């Protein structure tokens, strides 16, 4: 079993992981950093992010106060206001650094940054690169990181578990690209593993978003919070044969798109004064209720009234995808339905990204900073990632860590071949159980799904005594464990109380 040592270990190659590597290297160019990616370095949620980054830029019309208020309102009273203030006031500085790193953003006719509008925002403040902002960020940052002599990148590395001793995180174990069992010792370990959208049957997230960081945290008794708040994006294209849904950016609704029911009515105007530009939780719930009312599987996005040439210029990715699927947006309505999109809860961290285990940190979607509360405001996620990576870099480079890994029998991994199709059955069953109604539906639906997933977890553990001897097996276990914690938090209080009461009597 091979061992690797480094000062800083970063698990994940989205904006959080990449920008942390860059910030650390700017402060200390000689700092040894190891960056892990589960597959290719660009396969992550950031790569697929369409909308942009929320930044107060036009101070004649907008203000930090307005952005703060919009964020707090979207979060339904569960945001940490101190965190919200900090992230939003830091945004312009972090945006300037992205621009210095070569990220190109759209300009308006006057040569300034073009500011888009999205749901829940009271002002235009979304900076963007057409409808593929995340792609632009990833493709500009990756070459910068690859050129840094102090950063080693390992792709196709699957992390199975953290190594925790006496409350300290000493690194992790996993399998390298050849399937070789590996221990990585680190003075500081940073989880930037992204979200858990693949827990659900329909998601906008790529196949790598399997809750790995959260699941490793669960197994190491690292504190989590608000895992039940999974954000569903209201406008994913309805394609029943696909589990990874194509996202239709919220910016299109800011541009003027309408959402219609089967009668061609803009039903959202009856639900909220902002109609299509209400926050994502409001729009997704309204769509779900409308589909239930109609006994249908989708509603419709109307783009027919929008100026076609300008639309093609601003949203080329969406236009091309619609065309490939046979839709003429000047004549056809686009079928849409909500899809699991963002994990608002996660690993609890403080203002510098530290967890409740020493030398273990978390940033990005896998973390819970308090910024998003119960519902993330559109385009605040990339902002959170870069602000926290900057702050964590400052902390890590000003802190002296001393650590010694004490290898023992529990850290030994052995690679074992598995029956892929048998493991896949567990994953498929989970995704059939997990849908919007599983966490936001009627009480009995939530309880039923929790019972089904708990039973699935029991069967998995009975069949596979060891989950960590193959990446696909461990990843499937991560999905089921993450689903159970999401559902456990979603259970009605009365159900939890009754279960606790029965256990006490026993």
Segments predicted by a language model, with ranges:
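Short hydrophobic core segments
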Residues: 9-11, 184-193
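Glycine- and aromatic-enriched mobile tails/lids
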Residues: 3-6, 20-23, 29-32, 40-42, ...
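Short beta-strand to alpha-helix junction loop
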Residues: 79-92, 125-143, 154, 203-211, ...
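Conserved N-terminal glycine-rich FAD pyrophosphate-binding loop of Rossmann-like flavoproteins
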Residues: 39-72, 76
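FAD-site-proximal beta/loop scaffold in flavoenzymes
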Residues: 161-181, 327-369
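Conserved redox-cofactor binding core of oxidoreductases
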Residues: 100-180, 192, 236-239, 259
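An anion/pyrophosphate-binding glycine-rich loop and adjacent beta-alpha core
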Residues: 216, 222-332, 385-386, 395-399
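Beta1/beta-strand and adjacent pyrophosphate-binding region of the FAD-binding site
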Residues: 2-16
């Amino acid at each position: 079993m091979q061992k690797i040592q480094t000062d800083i270990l970063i698990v994940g190659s989205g904006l959080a992981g990449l920008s942390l590597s860059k910030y650390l290297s700017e402060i200390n160019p000689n700092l040894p950093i190891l960056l892990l990616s589960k597959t290719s370095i660009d396969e992550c949620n950031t790569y697929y992010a369409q909308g942009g980054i929320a930044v107060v830029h036009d101070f004649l019309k907008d203000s930090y106060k307005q952005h703060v208020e919009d964020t707090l309102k979207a979060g339904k009273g569960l945001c940490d206001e101190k965190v919200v203030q900090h992230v939003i006031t830091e945004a312009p500085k972090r945006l300037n650094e992205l621009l210095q790193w070569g990220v190109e953003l759209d300009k308006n006719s006057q040569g300034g940054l073009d500011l888009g509008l999205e749901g829940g925002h009271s002002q235009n403040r979304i900076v963007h690169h057409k409808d593929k902002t995340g792609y632009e960020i990833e493709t500009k940052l990756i070459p910068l990181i690859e050129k840094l002599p102090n950063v080693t990148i390992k792709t196709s590395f699957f992390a199975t578990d953290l190594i925790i001793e006496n409350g300290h995180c000493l690194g992790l174990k996993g399998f390298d690209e050849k399937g070789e069992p590996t221990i990585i010792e680190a003075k500081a370990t940073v989880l930037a593993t992204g979200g858990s959208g693949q827990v659900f049957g329909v998601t906008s997230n790529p196949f790598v978003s399997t809750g790995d960081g959260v699941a490793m945290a669960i197994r190491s008794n690292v504190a989590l919070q608000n895992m039940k708040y999974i954000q569903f994006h209201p406008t994913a294209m309805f394609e029943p044969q696909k589990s990874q849904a194509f996202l239709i950016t919220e910016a299109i609704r800011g541009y003027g798109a309408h959402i219609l029911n089967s009668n061609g009515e803009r039903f959202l105007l009856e639900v909220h004064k902002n109609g299509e530009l209400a926050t994502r939780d409001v729009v997704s719930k309204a769509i779900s209720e409308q589909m239930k009312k109609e006994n249908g599987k989708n509603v419709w996005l109307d783009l027919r009234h929008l100026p076609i040439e300008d639309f093609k210029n601003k949203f080329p990715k969406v236009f091309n995808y619609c065309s490939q699927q046979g839709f003429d947006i000047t004549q056809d309505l686009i079928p849409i339905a909500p899809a699991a999109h963002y994990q608002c809860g996660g690993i609890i961290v403080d203002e510098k990204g530290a967890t409740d285990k020493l030398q273990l940190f978390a940033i990005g979607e896998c973390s819970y900073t308090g910024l998003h509360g119960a519902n993330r405001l559109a385009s605040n996620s990339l902002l959170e990632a870069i602000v926290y990576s900057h702050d964590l870099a400052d902390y890590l480079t000003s802190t002296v860590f001393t650590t010694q890994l004490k290898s023992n029998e529990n850290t030994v991994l052995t690679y074992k071949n598995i029956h892929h199709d048998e493991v896949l059955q567990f994953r498929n069953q989970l995704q059939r159980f997990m849908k919007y109604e599983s966490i936001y539906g009627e009480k009995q639906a939530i309880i039923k799904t929790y019972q089904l997933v708990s039973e699935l977890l029991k069967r998995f553990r009975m069949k596979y005594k060891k989950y960590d001897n193959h990446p696909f097996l461990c990843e499937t276990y991560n999905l089921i464990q993450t689903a159970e914690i999401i559902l456990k938090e979603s259970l009605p209080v009365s159900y939890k109380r009754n279960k606790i009461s029965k256990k006490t009597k026993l």
